[in-house]
Regions:
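Conserved ATP-binding TGD loop and adjacent catalytic N/P-domain core of P-type ATPases
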Residues: 14, 31, 418, 509-511, ...
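Flexible metal-binding regulatory segments at protein termini and peripheral loops
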Residues: 3-128, 154, 245-246, 326, ...
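Conserved catalytic phosphorylation-site environment of P-type ATPases
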Residues: 286, 382, 392-468, 623, ...
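Conserved cytosolic catalytic loops of P-type ATPases
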Residues: 41-63, 199, 228-322, 422-465, ...
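Transmembrane helix-loop-helix hairpins at the membrane interface
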Residues: 101-237, 348, 451, 719
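Juxtamembrane coupling segments of multi-pass membrane pumps/enzymes
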Residues: 203-264, 295, 345, 418, ...
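Signature of the cytosolic headpiece of P-type E1-E2 ATPases
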Residues: 8, 476, 485-597, 612
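Membrane-embedded alpha-helical bundles of multi-pass transporters
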Residues: 122-125, 157, 176, 410, ...
Length: 746
């Protein structure tokens, strides 16, 4: 059973954190950071999302600290934010500064590159033109492209290479060759060759790469808008009440047990319990319901929800990363940072990409010289530089994470939480959905609508029934308890309570055994049903109501009719699933007539009644043996075995249970109509991932041979390094823009 933990309480006592990473310039950098952290003792799993600039790490805090990880990452030439009170805010501030510097460098590089290109391609005979171009190119390299050379050298000293290496190497070769020809033109003139210079290539390559990075940063910022929106729900400060006085403090200062004051129109800062006052609270960010919820003393309120009317005080019960909102944010971040199975292959390719490209560039240079000798030296150099420039590991590195970020973020906005890329990929392959009835297709708030007592002395039996149901965890137990409380039933002394899995409960009072549950208990206790009672049961079942049997020893005492309304959106959800070609099945522990009624109402062709938890698991296995990809949808209580067995486990959440949910997919609002939307979203996201990867691979497969001059013998076409740099910049941006299309898909 797959599960993502925010805090795993198993024997390893591992924790999972999402930490911002700085100074990464391409996908190769992400791989370097990931391998550096993964190699540390005490780290169970590390995954770097280049698009988000984050490290998701699962580690044992008793073996390794975050500071040790930070030191290792810094030693590798990058930075990891671990000590800040608000690491996300710090990352955003650094990202803003980085973007500001990047924009300034891009504008500066283009300001000098335009006259440089004009001098090199149009006004080639201007006096001292070569010297002017040399100064312009050198200024671009030093003032606006310095980071490429600093990072390239830094990684080279560590025996590593990345995209900065390719840019630094290509522009340096073009500049040094041009400088040699400017200083020693006679070397080539003596051989009867023209001493060409390519200063404009050095400058324009840097300008195009910077422009591509600027556009990429803008686009990547859009991919993370959903998670930023979730983070923005939580206020930065809270009004702490101490000895009757209010003081505004950062929410990071709040502790469990603190008393906080909340005024009308304000966002609630932490999870807690309302102490004084009453109000209506907008919980749509969690529940999806636009109608405000009335809150009174003793009620639970959640961080990020909005207090609409009255002022109140509350006691903090969850702060920081333990609030429901923080748990959701961490879940989405972890999901965005997860890797699709295909990404493992991409990572391996990215790891060797730069060395292979450098080798191809060298072979290109050698081949040109072998074919044409010294007269082709300029062609050889230009082609080698073009190969270095056009190759783009970033497009490969961005293909999967950008699509995942947009897809997972869009899901969160629609109240759909997908745990990781594995779940996403499995969800898109689902062709069969198995639905539990109670709480999935129905409201999950059953009520007792009728009762039939065989015994006359039912007052005593009401107390016993009340005691038995108080200990039961079955969804129908709450309905019976509410009904009994209205009848004035009380708890009585009891012993030997036993839960009969899938059937009901058994309890002893004063040495006498009582039982309550499904019709299967009649066989266990050999109790019969009077004919007049049987007719009443038949009528209830015809109406789609569930029947609960209550007895003493071998005698049936009473039967209760319980109704659980079908959700308004269930029929539409089933219809949408069928439109997508998905086979829908219904499993329920209720009787056959109830199952028939629900299946007929919702137009579900396959159903099975009177199933116990192990029956549900066997049903899932039987479908899988037929070659079907099965998703199981349930409430996670009685369906745990089936959920674990299914290819995709889907839980119907209720907003406040999110942090404890271990299903692959959680529908936060318990609205089944979210399910077809989740499957559609998974298909769209996976399709985009493969589109991005196809484009990234095809771009490099076609671009590198073109840059090497494969068309030159055919039509004399040789790709200019400046055009190669433009193509490289476009490839990364196009991948991100393609991922952003997902935002607007229905």
């Amino acid at each position: 059973q797959r599960q993502m933990c925010i805090r795993d309480s198993d024997m390893r006592e591992t924790e999972t954190k999402v930490l911002p990473v700085l100074e990464m310039s391409c996908a190769v950098c992400a791989g370097n950071v990931e391998s550096t952290v993964q190699a540390l003792s005490g780290v169970e799993k590390a995954s770097v999302n280049f698009a988000a600039g984050t490290l998701t790490v699962t580690y044992n805090p008793s073996v390794i600290t975050l500071e040790v990880m930070q030191a290792a990452v810094q030693a590798a030439g990058y930075d990891l934010i671990v000590e800040a009170e608000d690491p996300v805010a710090m990352q955003e501030e650094k990202a803003r500064m980085h973007y500001k510097i990047l924009r300034r460098n891009t504008i500066g590089a283009w300001t000098l590159s335009i006259p440089l290109a004009l001098l090199g391609m149009v006004f080639m005979h201007v006096p001292f033109g070569n010297w002017i171009m040399m100064v312009l190119a050198l200024a671009i390299m030093i003032f606006f492209g310095r980071s490429f050379y600093v990072n390239g050298v830094r990684h080279a000293l560590k025996g590593k290479a990345n995209m900065d290496t390719l840019v630094a190497l290509s522009t340096s070769i073009a500049f040094l060759f041009s400088l040699f020809n400017t200083l020693c033109p006679g070397f080539w003139l003596g051989k009867g060759l023209e001493p060409h210079v390519y200063y404009e290539a050095s400058g324009v390559i840097i300008a195009f790469v910077l422009l591509g990075k600027l556009m990429e940063e803008r686009a990547k910022n859009s991919t993370s808008s959903a998670i930023k929106g979730l983070m923005g729900l939580q206020p930065k400060t809270a009004r702490l009440v101490t000895d009757g006085r209010e003081e505004e403090v950062p929410i990071s200062n709040l502790q469990v047990g603190n008393v906080v004051s909340v005024r009308p129109g304000e966002k609630i800062p932490v999870d807690g319990t309302l102490l004084q006052g009453s109000s209506s609270v907008d919980e749509s960010m969690l529940s999806g319901e636009p109608i405000p919820v009335e809150k009174n003393a003793g009620d639970r309120v959640l961080a990020g929800t909005i207090n609409q009317k009255g002022a109140f005080t509350m006691e903090a019960t969850s702060v920081g990363g333990t609030t429901v909102l923080a748990q959701i944010v961490q879940m989405v971040q972890s999901a965005q940072g997860s890797k699709a199975p295909v990404q493992r292959i991409v990572d391996k390719i990215s790891g060797i990409f730069v060395p292979v490209v450098v080798l191809l560039s060298f072979l290109t240079f050698v081949c040109w010289l072998v074919i044409g000798g010294e007269s082709y030296f300029s062609y050889a150099l230009l082609s080698a530089v073009s190969v270095l420039v056009i190759a783009c590991p970033c497009a490969l590195g961005l293909a999967t994470p950008t699509a995942l970020m947009v897809g997972m973020g869009k899901g969160a906005e629609q109240h759909i939480l997908i745990k990781d890329a594995f779940a996403l990929e499995n969800l898109c392959k689902v062709d069969t959905v198995v639905l539990d009835k109670t709480g999935t297709l129905t409201e999950g708030v059953p009520v007792v609508t009728d009762s039939y007592w065989i015994s006359d002395d039912n007052i005593r039996y009401l107390d016993v029934l009340y005691t038995a149901e108080q200990k039961s965890e079955h969804p129908l137990a709450s309905a019976i308890l509410c009904w009994l409380e209205e009848s004035g039933a009380k708890v009585c002394e009891a012993e030997n309570f036993e839960s009969l899995t899938g059937r009901g409960v058994r309890i002893q009072v004063e040495g006498v055994t009582y039982w309550v549950g499904s019709q299967g208990l009649l066989d266990i206790f050999q109790a019969g049903i009077p004919e007049k009672v049987r007719k009443q049961i038949g009528q209830w079942q015809e109406d789609g109501q569930s029947v609960v049997f209550y007895g003493q020893e071998t005698r049936l005492l009473a039967v209760l009719a319980i109704s659980d309304r079908i959700k308004p959106t269930s029929a539409e959800a089933v219809k949408e699933l069928k439109k997508q070609g998905i086979e829908v099945h219904l499993l329920t522990g209720d009787g056959v007539r109830t199952a028939e009624r629900v299946a007929a109402t919702l137009d579900i062709g396959y159903y099975k009644a009177e199933v116990m938890p192990n029956d549900k698991e066997e049903y899932i296995i039987s479908l899988q043996q037929q070659g079907k990809k099965v998703a199981m949808v349930g409430d996670g209580i009685n369906d745990s075995q089936a959920l674990a067995r299914a290819d995709v486990s889907i839980a119907m959440g209720k907003g406040t249970d999110i942090a404890m949910d271990v299903a692959m997919v959680t529908l936060i609002t318990s609205d089944l109509l979210l399910l077809p939307g989740a499957i559609r979203l998974s298909k769209q996201t996976v399709r985009l991932i493969y589109q991005n990867l196809f484009w990234a691979f095809i771009y490099n497969v076609i671009g590198i041979p073109l840059a090497a001059g494969v068309l030159f013998p055919i039509n004399g076409l040789l790709l200019n390094p400046m055009l190669a740099s433009a193509a490289m910049a476009f490839s990364s941006v196009s991948v991100v823009l393609n991922s952003l299309r997902l935002k607007f898909m229905k």
